[in-house]
Amino acid sequence: MEKSKLAGEQTRIEDLGGNKYKWTYGSVSDTILADGTDQPTHFGKTISIAPEGANNWKMVIKNDGKVLSSMTHALSEDGKTQTIKGTETKPDGTTSDFNVVLKRVGSGSGWEGTWESTDVKFTSPDEWEIEAYDGDGLTFNTPAYQDVLSMKFDGKDYEEKGPNVAPSSTSAGKRVNPHTLEVTNKVKGQVLDHTKFEVSQDGKTLTLTIREIGQPKALTIVYDKM
């Protein structure tokens, strides 16, 4: 994961007044009342935001009442950076700490404005298991998340399953060549991203290039074969 490039994603926060904020991430927006109560989000999870002074927020994300992650957002005194520190709890019970630094892009004051990640760190790397499926297809399994996607590369939608997977999550893909796949991921028919899977010539690394709808930069995730 050291070769991965996880920074560059943008989030826009709009202050709607009355302690209510609109969060836009890529092509998805949610309106959250920052009063510490669980608020529904676009894909069925909930978010709670509790102000802790003028420059700090406590955020908790849940799915079916179970905590997925909890974190603090700290705004710098000059209002130019945010630092997010938190812990993710995976379905298998393991945890991973994370630290994200964001810079303000363009105008805005306080929490309001466009924020771009400049540094993203996790203490626990993700692991994938990839196996053959139904002849020329593949099954992608992430054990820690208990997430499974079995698909063929015929352009048809295949459903992704797992305890934290958004309802009606599907993927469709094609083989570009023996080392490259292109996959489009959707939720309820809405395209969220286009992802390219590339296996190195020596078969030792898998590189994912993820282009999320509404994001200015692609993410690169590199996995080493175990």
Task: Give a label for each model feature.
Residues 1-226:
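Hydrophobic small-molecule pocket/channel-lining residues, especially in calycin-type beta-barrels
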